[in-house]
């Protein structure tokens, strides 16, 4: 299911001329993390990236995952044209009515003993999430 989710967003991004580079190395047994939770996390990350790349001269998305020592790490770097940040440094949705993507990603990471970090710098939005598998 995770691969199908990634392929869906990869195709969507490529249709808009975005360069996409996705390498996911996720083991069959991901411990206590459900397939649906992982699909939501990967899907939200990629959906945000595809949306952020609109209006960028050279749009790109690069996603990687790695599993080591019982920890799954997923990183995603993408170009962006516009971000909205709150005074506390957290990010606000650019979507009409607001979005929950980053909050859902962070909540899933915390639920599984992990964490998340999001940063926008010099036209690149960096997302990194880690989850404990056991």
PLM feature spans:
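Glycine-rich/acidic phosphate-handling loop/turn and adjacent ATP-lid/helix
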Residues: 70-103
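Glycine-rich nucleotide-binding loop
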Residues: 82, 121-128
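Glycine-rich ATP-binding loops of the HATPase_c
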Residues: 113-123
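Conserved glycine-/histidine-rich ATP-lid loop and adjacent helix of the Bergerat-fold HATPase_c
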Residues: 104-114
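Conserved short strand/loop->alpha-helix "switch" segment adjacent to the catalytic nucleotide/phosphoryl-transfer site
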Residues: 19-41
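Short beta-to-alpha transition helix within the HATPase_c
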Residues: 1-16
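Short beta-strand/loop element within the Bergerat-fold HATPase_c
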Residues: 56, 60-70
